Curated annotation (Swiss-Prot):
Protein name as annotated: Thiazole synthase
PANTHER family from the UniProt entry: THIAZOLE SYNTHASE
GO cellular component: 2-iminoacetate synthase complex; cytoplasm
Catalyzed reaction equations: [ThiS sulfur-carrier protein]-C-terminal-Gly-aminoethanethioate + 2-iminoacetate + 1-deoxy-D-xylulose 5-phosphate = [ThiS sulfur-carrier protein]-C-terminal Gly-Gly + 2-[(2R,5Z)-2-carboxy-4-methylthiazol-5(2H)-ylidene]ethyl phosphate + 2 H2O + H(+)
Record EC number: 2.8.1.10
Function: Catalyzes the rearrangement of 1-deoxy-D-xylulose 5-phosphate (DXP) to produce the thiazole phosphate moiety of thiamine. Sulfur is provided by the thiocarboxylate moiety of the carrier protein ThiS. In vitro, sulfur can be provided by H(2)S.
Family from the record: Belongs to the ThiG family.
Amino acid sequence: MADDPFVLGGTTYASRLIMGTGGAPSLDVLERALVASGTELTTVAMRRVNASVHGSVLSVLERLGIRVLPNTAGCFTAGEAVLTARLAREALGTDLVKLEVIADERTLLPDPVELLDAAETLVDDGFTVLPYTNDDPVLARKLEDAGCAAIMPLGSPIGSGLGIRNPHNFQLIVEHARVPVILDAGAGTASDVALAMELGCAGVMLASAVTRAQEPVLMAAAMRAGVEAGRLARRAGRIPRRHFAEASSPAEGLAVLDPERPAF
């Protein structure tokens, strides 16, 4: 929407949905899902992609005019993540990086110590850093203070489809952030992304929820609609929650009936 721009790292996007590419059953399905999602920014794991291979994910993104967001998936230390980001910048000519530093393979949760270390190094090196982080308001503030261009907290573990398990923390992060907050990981269906937007997130990043759905292209369209609906609801302002009913029709003007007089 022209009156509601999504600005990330100095670039304005029409879509607030950032897509991932992992888990798609084929390049054809991935391409159709990307089109259905309306995304303009899509992540690619640089440790798993050969930028020189034609017919790859990168060639699909180039053909569709979608900007590549390299990520450091698969890195377990700050050093690995920094090296991967620098290789991505050299290969793709972009300073934009989705920073991931994972604590272990079982949970795929971020390592907060290594993440903050890598973020500080990459910001100093001129990168536009978008960190995948825990839903921790304190860590979110430290990442913002380090110079990150956005905060990307998880709603629940990667690929779990559990949605946002701690909406209160998301609200705290959104209320104090001066940069965009983007849901990253945990979405399972369109209602999850709508909730994220209603809580005040500026955007949503997802992959598995679409690529591993029974109908990826259909789910991509659903996610697009969910993001748009949630954003509109946030801007509109929901009614307050109440313990008791409140009639929507006014009491003024109701007929006063005499119980002793017949109606007809």
